[in-house]
Amino acid sequence: MSTTEESAKLFADASSVIPGGVNSPVRAFNSVGGTPRFITSAKGCRLTDVDGNQYVDLVCSWGPMILGHAHPAVVEAVQRVAAHGLSFGAPTPSESELAREIIDRVAPVERVRLVNSGTEATMSAIRLARGFTGRAKIVKFSGCYHGHSDALLADAGSGVATLGLPSSPGVTGAAAADTLVLPYNNVAAVEEIFAQFGDEIACVITEASPGNMGTVPPLPGFNAALRRITAAHGALLIVDEVMTGFRVSRSGWYGLDPVDADLFTFGKVMSGGLPAAAFGGTAEVMGRLAPLGPVYQAGTLSGNPVAMAAGLATLRAADDAAYAKLDANADRLVGLIGDALTEAGVTHQIPRAGNMFSVFFGGDPVTDFASAKATETWRFPAFFHALLDAGIYPPPSAYEAWFVSTALDDEAFDRIADALPGAARAAAQAAA
């Protein structure tokens, strides 16, 4: 059993100055209990906390760290650029370089606007879709999380799912009035809502492959059906690749399921672990943005040169061999987890979206938010803590995705393999 004395002290101190002691709710361990670990350093696939405990990292900062932590090429790029200044509030060459890198990887994207977070990216894409179409209503799917702007928190996943809330206090009826929420993976529901409101709907926004109600991949043809329906009604399709973008393939989910959306949003991997994100799409739609057009969007730190350096270094190091390694590591990890749970007699499923996955307990297929919430989530805290105590750091919520990096090595997999039988038994013995 590892000690958490210093983490507990720091959490108490943080709670006196930061609401809940954390700056993103899932970090508080509310859904699994126990003391959040305060991390002091990371290298490769390993995290070290303030108490000196070391963990094999299966969260990867919620996705961005595909190359592992402190990758030499990324660190060198950040240090080199930071030495010349941290922020200028003026254009820099690296902004265009990163935009071009995205355009080269995702064929439908012809123009890119850089922002600071995934929330900004989706919020701005929604505003642009409304400005382009002159319509007000948007369609989103239950359990899909697109950041914490008011209109998009209606029946969202991620931290809202972890907290068991259908939405969030503070989101007014007026803010959500034009948000139409449908069950995920249900083409008939989309067709019905367009039959009713088609000439009022500006856009449909969907996660390319959801990872915020757990990993729940789209059924075959679902995203293509969204493209067909939106095009038929003059609405835009926004595909949110903040999580999947440049993680599940060189071209993100688009590389696995090439549906030509009007707008895409990106984050996480494209910034190499620093705060940056983007949205992009066709030249026609993106041309409505200020200063070319009337749809306003701006940001003091957008295109920050240090974040651009981290993103460019990450994407340029993520070659075909890196993506093959990510897939192989996910295959190996999923196999180990599945074998351990089967051996312990725990009914489970491990849905995949490329090299992302989640662990659901129970036998009914998970295809949407309702079926995700119907799983035996009460088994997850025991499973989580058994792994954590053995030096493995999984996501502290049953509704989050697990992430691998290229840095996972044989020693890390041996440690995981040693920890899993006990964790599986803990899940088997958990009480509802």
From Swiss-Prot:
Matching entries from HAMAP family are given as: HemL_aminotrans_3 (MF_00375)
Organism domain of life: Bacteria
The signal peptide, as residue positions, is none
Its main localization is cytoplasm
Residues recorded as bearing N6-(pyridoxal phosphate)lysine in the entry: K268
| GO biological processes | protoporphyrinogen IX biosynthetic process
Instruction: List GO terms (cellular component aspect).
Output: cytoplasm
GO molecular function (one): transaminase activity
Reaction catalyzed: (S)-4-amino-5-oxopentanoate = 5-aminolevulinate
Q: What pathway or pathways are given for this protein in its record?
A: Porphyrin-containing compound metabolism; protoporphyrin-IX biosynthesis; 5-aminolevulinate from L-glutamyl-tRNA(Glu): step 2/2
What's the Enzyme Commission number for this chain?
5.4.3.8
Q: Which cofactor does it need?
A: pyridoxal 5'-phosphate
Q: Which UniProt keywords apply?
A: Cytoplasm, Isomerase, Porphyrin biosynthesis, Pyridoxal phosphate
Quote the protein name from its UniProt record.
Answer: Glutamate-1-semialdehyde 2,1-aminomutase
Please state the gene responsible for encoding this protein. Answer: hemL
Q: Where is this protein localized, as stated in its record? A: Cytoplasm
The similarity annotation says: Belongs to the class-III pyridoxal-phosphate-dependent aminotransferase family. HemL subfamily.
Pfam families in alphabetical order: Aminotran_3
Gene source species: Mycolicibacterium gilvum (strain PYR-GCK) (Mycobacterium gilvum (strain PYR-GCK))
